[in-house]
Amino acid sequence: MKILIMGLPGSGKTYLAKRMQPILKAAWYNADIVREMANDWDFSPEGRIRQSLRMKNLADFEKSQGRIVICDFVCPTSETKKNFNPDITIWMNTIKSGRYEDTNKMFEEPSEVDYKVIEMNDTNHETIAAKILENV
């Protein structure tokens, strides 16, 4: 199962992923770490597409091994989300603008999500993880 945690920079994607990972016993790929490993800091539309495909390949490998995998990354456009092709989408809709103006301009609100987080709290991760595990 591929879980996408998406949202603007600073919305709490990594915070949520870090807390959900042990509950789900999932593999976890953070976009910043993956970009660092690839030495690819291109945030242009083309760079974003490349990153979505990179995250997809990692997640698809984990899924093919029967594991749950969490990927947290901005995933700013419908094209990047389509490329990644998540089984579950969690949108961190906790802020209206992030710290990078180019990302704010590029970011498209997703049309379909499974979970929409509108505020950060100490229980979101438990609630969402429990619901996911009910359906595994």
Q: Model-derived features: where do they sit?
A:
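Conserved substrate/cofactor phosphate-moiety recognition/catalytic segment
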Residues: 17-60
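Hydrophobic anchor at the beta1->P-loop junction of P-loop NTPases
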Residues: 5-7
